[in-house]
Amino acid sequence: MEHFISLFVRAVFIENMALAFFLGMCTFLAVSKNVTTAFGLGIAVTVVLGISVPANNLVYNLVLRDGALVEGVDLSFLNFITFIGVIAALVQILEMILDRYFPSLYNALGIFLPLITVNCAIFGGVSFMAQRDYNFSESIVYGFGSGIGWMLAIVLLASIREKMKYADVPAGLKGLGITFVTTGLMALGFMSFSGVQL
């Protein structure tokens, strides 16, 4: 149990997808203007990561890994295309659910919801799972931990950006300039967790 807690904390804080690896920055910067929308996208990314990492773990271990189907047959060259296909299918299902049951969130996310399919944070989580050779239970913990970490980062940035609307920001830094500075400072803050040994 201690191993899973360590893996979860490492995925959320130490190896944060947005602030340690800078993955998923296009949606991270574009949707972080409003806390509610950022939280909704964070939930969507968490759900997709939490489901796609274990699903791709099964596909990788049962089909793609060297010798998984037949001894001596290595289908690992199909990793990228297969992982993206599984992610795309899961995002389409999530999009249909949001459109049906949460239309306001679906409309607020707009084009960024289908872009979760090609969000490099999602693909990064799946790739790290394969590289680090996580088993199925570790991939569940890592997927949800990575999603929670990404959601934490985008909600923190959105809340800071909402407060900065009332700040006296220099003209040259207004908009994305101050957002990049803020993101960099947040990344420095999260770097302090890198010394933690779990």
Curated annotation (Swiss-Prot):
Enzyme class, broadest EC rank: translocase
GO biological process assignments: respiratory electron transport chain; sodium ion transport
InterPro entries (UniProt xref): NqrDE/RnfAE, NqrDE/RnfAE_oxidrdctase, NqrE
Regions crossing the membrane: 11-31, 35-55, 77-97, 109-129, 140-160, 176-196
Electron transport recorded as keyword: no
Gene Ontology CC, one term: plasma membrane
One Pfam family hit: Rnf-Nqr
GO function term, MF aspect, one: oxidoreductase activity, acting on NAD(P)H, quinone or similar compound as acceptor
Cellular localization per UniProt: Cell inner membrane
Catalytic activity: a ubiquinone + n Na(+)(in) + NADH + H(+) = a ubiquinol + n Na(+)(out) + NAD(+)
Membership in a protein family: Belongs to the NqrDE/RnfAE family.
Function of the protein: NQR complex catalyzes the reduction of ubiquinone-1 to ubiquinol by two successive reactions, coupled with the transport of Na(+) ions from the cytoplasm to the periplasm. NqrA to NqrE are probably involved in the second step, the conversion of ubisemiquinone to ubiquinol.
PANTHER family: INTEGRAL MEMBRANE PROTEIN OF SOXR-REDUCING COMPLEX, NA(+)-TRANSLOCATING NADH-QUINONE REDUCTASE SUBUNIT E
Subunit (UniProt): Composed of six subunits; NqrA, NqrB, NqrC, NqrD, NqrE and NqrF.
Protein name: Na(+)-translocating NADH-quinone reductase subunit E
Species, as recorded: Photorhabdus laumondii subsp. laumondii (strain DSM 15139 / CIP 105565 / TT01)
